[in-house]
Regions:
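FIC/Doc superfamily catalytic core
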Residues: 1-96, 100-197
Length: 197
């Protein structure tokens, strides 16, 4: 797949295409937007299904306004990437496989912007911790630190040859593919907490 990646569009439709490609032999619903509200690892819930359309438009428009991260210095790229990466992570459009799908998606965005990621330089634990902190607190500092380690200009060779090497190095911080479906009472509590009508 990596040899023939199309140009980045920065859209959820492209995320759906990637997800379908990766998981078509695993899930009947590969490439389809989730139909349930979810949380993972006991943290804050992902974007509410009820407002998925708004979330999709926000993620796509923010990335588009940032010109798909093109024409930026490496520091600007990392800063804007961290915000956009967190936006799409919070959106969490699929029941499973969001992380792997996002890696391909962001690899495309990075390549078109003149960069690539050496994912094998970090562990799954680093990725989990940075993603969880950003999702739960909207603080992207750990994501920025992570991307500072793995972001390289295209002309610099990658050290780690396996794109997904960090997925198998050690235990997950939270069990993979384990998510909680929000019950009505949980969803009502979050709606009250965040003032959602």
């Amino acid at each position: 797949m990596y040899e023939h990646l199309p140009h980045a569009e920065g859209t959820v439709k492209q995320l759906q295409w990637i997800h379908h490609y990766l998981f078509q032999d695993v899930y009947d619903w590969a490439g389809q937007i989730r139909t349930i509200d979810m949380t993972k690892g006991g943290g804050e819930p992902f974007h509410p299904l009820e407002y998925m359309g708004v979330g999709i438009r926000y993620c796509e428009q923010t990335l588009k306004n940032d010109n798909l991260l093109q024409g930026l210095s490496i520091d600007e790229f990392i800063s804007k990437l961290s915000v956009n990466y967190n936006n799409f992570n919070v959106l969490h459009p699929f029941r499973e496989g969001n992380g792997r799908t996002q890696r391909v998606f962001w690899d495309m965005v990075a390549r078109d912007a003149g960069y690539h990621f050496d994912w094998g330089l970090i562990t799954q634990r680093v990725n989990d911790k940075a993603s969880i902190q950003a999702k739960d607190t909207n603080d992207t500092k750990l994501l920025e630190d992570m991307f500072r380690i793995i972001t390289k200009p295209l002309q610099v060779d990658l050290l780690a040859q396996q794109q997904f090497a960090h997925l198998v190095e050690e235990e997950y911080e939270y069990a993979p593919n384990v998510a909680s479906v929000l019950q009505d009472k949980d969803y009502a509590a979050y709606k009250t907490r965040y003032g959602i009508d």
